[in-house]
Amino acid sequence: MRLSASLFHIALVTVLLVLAGCSVTPSEDFSPINVTNAAQAKAWELQGKIAVKTSEDKFSTNLYWLHQTKANDLRLTTVLGTTVLTLKTNQGMATLDVDGKTYRDSNAQDLLTGISGWSIPLDSLPLWITGQIGSNDKIVSYNPDGTIKQLISHDPEANWVVSFLGWQQQSGAQVPRLLKIEREDVQIKIQTNQWIAVAAKTK
């Protein structure tokens, strides 16, 4: 099953309405912290935009992501704040809410691919978004300042080429400003407007 045409219509309207992103405020359970390296952040919040392009579809919308070591809350919204997709993971279970329906699976990647048809490397995104690499990644070029310019990530289906198109200072650390992730069947762009390292509040 694929995402309904209504979701893609909302997303395409969003492209026409895109405005500069406003500041994201950490959720009430977390406090912002400063780090010297993004790897030091055990949890973070991101506000930005994501665009997915395949041979069949084009999709672009706002992105909010609360990432923790064992849990995630990822939301796609219109510029007016309407949520069109929510993906949550916790304790080995993934839940996807879209088009008024809820789907569950033990594997978030399989769930998203099965429902949306998008082949997105979810497991690797938290690393790439913060300028880090995984065990399947090979850096092929650097920028003059030492930040990563491009890497290749091995995947059984087809390798991913990840281009870091800009870097910025956020929460005291250097993190990518714009990522382009592509292989022959899909192109993904993620723009980070604000990245905040956070820590759970002491109760």
From Swiss-Prot:
Main localization (coarse): membrane
Membrane topology label: Lipid-anchor
Signal peptide: 1-21
Residues where lipid is bound covalently (S-diacylglycerol cysteine): 22
Cellular localization per UniProt: Cell outer membrane
PROSITE patterns linked: PROKAR_LIPOPROTEIN
Sorted UniProt keywords: Cell outer membrane, Chaperone, Lipoprotein, Membrane, Palmitate, Protein transport, Signal, Transport
GO cellular component terms attached to this protein's record: cell outer membrane
N-palmitoyl cysteine lipid sites: 22
Transmembrane segments: none
Entry superkingdom: Bacteria
GO biological processes: lipoprotein localization to outer membrane; protein transport
Record's subunit section: Monomer.
HAMAP family, alphabetized: LolB
Function: Plays a critical role in the incorporation of lipoproteins in the outer membrane after they are released by the LolA protein.
Stated family: Belongs to the LolB family.
Name of the protein in question: Outer-membrane lipoprotein LolB
